[in-house]
């Protein structure tokens, strides 16, 4: 069984606004991951609700939706050895205040709700998310 995986990563509007795209993508590439697809776009609430379907209805969802639709983001598919766990480790914990130095959120994050990046959490999520953002890849 191969340990090559694909994962979806979003560089959220705060990463784009703060001009951190090159720095973040460079970190992924330096770790040996390959960008297989990438697109800059501003999403609407329909896509946000599909992407974050498991969060719709929770107390924090309205703020999440407002943030993720507030400006352009970068959606990309990264591929490589154990890509899902590698990317999640590189990103750091969701709450930037708790993220370790050396992680993307630990080095650049400013708050829990504006935490720069999203990454698929498992193979099933990766396939679902890649299908939503890049249907031609599934």
Swiss-Prot record:
Pfam families: NDK (PF00334). It is an enzyme of class 2 (transferase). GO terms for molecular function: ATP binding; metal ion binding; nucleoside diphosphate kinase activity. Its cofactor is Mg(2+). InterPro entries: NDK-like_dom, NDK-like_dom_sf, Nucleoside_diP_kinase. The active site is at 118 (pros-phosphohistidine intermediate). One of its GO terms (cellular component) is cytoplasm. It catalyses: a 2'-deoxyribonucleoside 5'-diphosphate + ATP = a 2'-deoxyribonucleoside 5'-triphosphate + ADP; a ribonucleoside 5'-diphosphate + ATP = a ribonucleoside 5'-triphosphate + ADP. PROSITE patterns: NDPK_LIKE (PS51374). Its main location: cytoplasm. One of its GO terms (biological process) is UTP biosynthetic process. It is found in: Cytoplasm. Keywords: ATP-binding, Cytoplasm, Kinase, Magnesium, Metal-binding, Nucleotide metabolism, Nucleotide-binding, Phosphoprotein, Transferase. Its EC number is 2.7.4.6. It comes from the Bacteria. SUPFAM superfamilies: Nucleoside diphosphate kinase, NDK. Major role in the synthesis of nucleoside triphosphates other than ATP. The ATP gamma phosphate is transferred to the NDP beta phosphate via a ping-pong mechanism, using a phosphorylated active-site intermediate. PANTHER family: NUCLEOSIDE DIPHOSPHATE KINASE (PTHR11349). Belongs to the NDK family. Homotetramer. This is Nucleoside diphosphate kinase.
